[in-house]
């Protein structure tokens, strides 16, 4: 007589296996720990307190007793982790065929991963692969995450949310937004010159009223923004701007546009940064017309000017705040900047300064400060941000960059089961994540804005 319910539990999928083959590679690998500080066990919102160092406390004693002086400056921000998830499935037949087909002779059932008892090949082979893919996603989103990210076609936002990046806010987005808002002072940002003169894309659309005009519509980056006709062409365009400006400028982060009303009945559209591109069109319903003027084509940054990385890193060190001198600082920069620096050194027939050990690896230095080259930045600037601002550098301390997650202690972070009907071993991973930097005084940037 067969059982109504049946369950198998082999191979034993233990928390130890999860920790050894998944959590440690994904959240504890040196590629993470060497860049940032990871804070775990944040399940929702946590307050990050910043206590300013007191000074000027000691005064001349001119009378009996004491007179208190000075105080602490306490500021804080909240960090709220956002839920993330990935799912992976694998059929045993394909797994064996690709990796260890010869082990079938030992008695394994090729369609049932559950029978892999000795050795625990599945956990030892597949979990690290999943962990590596998950970590690649984590690092990409850690830097380039943007809740307003949109899918891109030929460098132009499509109006469709890009869930490869929209889960939470990454460091690049923090830096760009806070430079624009002057939260990070302009003195802590260094402009980077390239061999190509860069330009923003620009266009002006001017409405001419028609006797039967009922509404206007301007499409920007595949999204239509409409406005009912008001008392005049000028009033209509002003109303359009008041209605849509905030929504339009909140889109797509560094790949977005700025809209203004430079003159009567006109709307000017400009890419947010040099090299950014956009699509647009305008029409009047029921009569009237639009005329386009002031057209400027976008020109992206080209190769770096000769010796530009050397000049940039030197300028970044000149911009270091007094507070930064108290910490171990590290440069992070794109591969394009690294190659430019190498060319400079070759031309001068000099070599890099002494290498230092960082997280068990020898890394080059610039004036004694370690350099971490991030070729992944080059890749994702091209893919996720249309290649605008391709040369970037960051100088900070790892203690200042914070990645918050609930992952390493969440007992429900990873699930696994074998679906007998589909003959698939499935894994589901979920964690919460968010990034923040603690102190604007501990950051110097280069190449992030115009």
Predicted regions span which residues?
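Short, glycine/acidic-rich hinge or "gate" loops at secondary-structure transitions
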Residues: 139-164, 262
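Solvent-exposed, polar/charged alpha-helical surfaces in well-ordered, non-transmembrane soluble domains
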Residues: 124, 128, 132, 238-242, ...
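Disulfide-bonded cysteine-rich modules in secreted/extracellular proteins
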Residues: 190-210
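Sec-exported extracytoplasmic/periplasmic mature domains
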Residues: 131, 135-139, 143, 245, ...
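Extended, beta-strand-rich, solvent-exposed assembly scaffolds of outer structural proteins
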Residues: 206-284, 303
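Sequence/fold signature of self-assembling virion shell proteins
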Residues: 2-51, 114, 159-191, 269, ...
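Internal, well-ordered alpha/beta segment that forms a basic, Gly-enriched binding/recognition surface
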Residues: 85-89, 100-101, 118-138
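Assembly/oligomerization interface modules of large self-assembling protein complexes
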Residues: 23-104, 154-174
């Amino acid at each position: 007589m067969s059982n109504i319910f049946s369950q198998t539990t082999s191979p034993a999928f233990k928390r130890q296996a999860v920790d050894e083959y998944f959590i440690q590679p994904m959240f504890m690998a040196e590629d993470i720990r060497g860049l940032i500080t990871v804070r775990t066990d944040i399940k929702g919102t946590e307050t990050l307190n910043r206590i300013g160092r007191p000074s000027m406390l000691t005064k001349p004693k001119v009378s009996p007793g004491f007179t208190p002086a000075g105080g602490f400056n306490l500021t804080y921000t909240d960090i709220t982790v956002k839920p993330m998830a990935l799912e992976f499935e694998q059929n045993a037949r394909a797994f064996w065929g690709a990796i260890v087909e010869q082990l079938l002779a030992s008695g394994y059932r090729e369609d049932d991963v559950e029978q892999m008892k000795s050795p625990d090949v599945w956990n030892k082979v597949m979990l690290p692969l999943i962990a590596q893919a998950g970590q690649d996603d984590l690092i990409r989103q850690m830097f380039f995450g943007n809740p307003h990210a949109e899918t891109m076609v030929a460098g132009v936002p499509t109006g469709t949310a890009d869930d490869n990046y929209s889960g939470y806010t990454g460091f690049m987005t923090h830096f760009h937004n806070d430079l624009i808002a002057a939260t990070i002072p302009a003195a802590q940002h260094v402009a980077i010159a390239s061999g190509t003169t860069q330009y923003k894309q620009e266009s002006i659309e001017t409405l001419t009223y028609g006797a039967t005009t009922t509404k206007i519509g301007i499409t920007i980056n595949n999204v239509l923004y409409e406005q009912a006709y008001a008392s005049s062409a000028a009033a209509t365009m002003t109303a359009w701007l008041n209605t849509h400006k905030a929504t339009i400028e909140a889109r797509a982060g560094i790949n977005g546009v700025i809209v203004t009303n430079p003159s009567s009945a006109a709307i000017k559209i400009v890419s947010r940064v040099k090299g950014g591109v956009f699509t647009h069109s305008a029409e009047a319903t029921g009569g009237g017309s639009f005329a386009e003027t002031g057209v400027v084509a976008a020109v992206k940054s080209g190769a770096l000017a000769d010796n530009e990385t050397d000049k940039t890193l030197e300028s970044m060190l000149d911009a270091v705040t007094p507070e930064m001198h108290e910490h171990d600082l590290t440069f992070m920069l794109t591969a394009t900047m690294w190659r430019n620096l190498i060319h400079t050194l070759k031309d001068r027939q000099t070599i890099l300064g002494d290498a230092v050990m960082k997280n068990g690896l020898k890394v080059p230095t610039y004036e004694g400060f370690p350099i971490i080259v991030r070729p992944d930045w080059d890749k994702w600037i091209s893919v996720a941000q249309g290649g605008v601002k391709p040369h970037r550098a960051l100088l900070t301390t790892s203690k200042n960059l914070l990645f918050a997650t609930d992952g390493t202690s969440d007992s429900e972070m990873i699930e696994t089961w074998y679906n007998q009907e589909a003959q698939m071993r499935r894994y589901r991973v979920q964690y919460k994540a968010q990034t923040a930097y603690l102190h604007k005084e501990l950051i110097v940037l280069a190449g992030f804005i115009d």
